[in-house]
Amino acid sequence: SEFFADGRGNRQPIAGTVPLGYAMPMHKDVDGSTGESPSPYKQVKFSSGVSYFDTGRFDNQWGTGIPVNEVTPEFIARGQERYAISCQVCHGDTGAGNGIAGKYGLVAIANLHQSRIRDMADGEIFNTITHGKNTMMGYGDRIQVQDRWAIVAYVRTLQAAKASSK
């Protein structure tokens, strides 16, 4: 390009720049502290931002990892509670796809222990909870962002329990 003296068509990013959608979220908590991932109990958030926390994606790739400082037993318990409210009716107690809804004619309820789902990145599971897939409706407007991640953590716990029982 003739616009810049060095012939480039654009400028290089400033050192330390993180591309949009690549940074793990580190939100300010409601009490004003920084550097902590959001608490699932203190914030209400249904938003659709562009960070990994909101989308499960880094640019055009599904991300792996739960975007909290630590996946604690309390966080997994929160996921279990939210799973029981929103997911269990179809996916069943253990995630095998044998919930009560299947007994009333709903077909193709996913077994969360299938290899195709076990092999999904955490971000893809988060996206499925958010937007739905096939016959599953999306829950992005019904389940807070933090709680969707807690459900992903709980689903991973169910999968690990099933794998260890083999």
Which role does the model predict for each range below?
Residues P73-A96, T130-H131, I151:
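Sequence/structural segment immediately N-terminal to covalent heme-attachment motifs in c-type
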Residues D29-S47, A84-G92, N111-D119:
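Phosphate-binding glycine-rich loops and adjacent basic patches that engage nucleotide phosphates
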Residues S1-V71, I143-V152:
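Periplasmic c-type cytochrome electron-transfer domains
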Residues L106-L158:
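Extracytoplasmic electron-transfer domains, predominantly the class I c-type cytochrome c fold
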Residues A84-A108, T135-G138, R142, T157-K166:
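Periplasmic/extracellular electron-transfer cofactor-ligation site
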Residues N69-P73, E81, K103-G105, I109, ...:
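Bimodal feature
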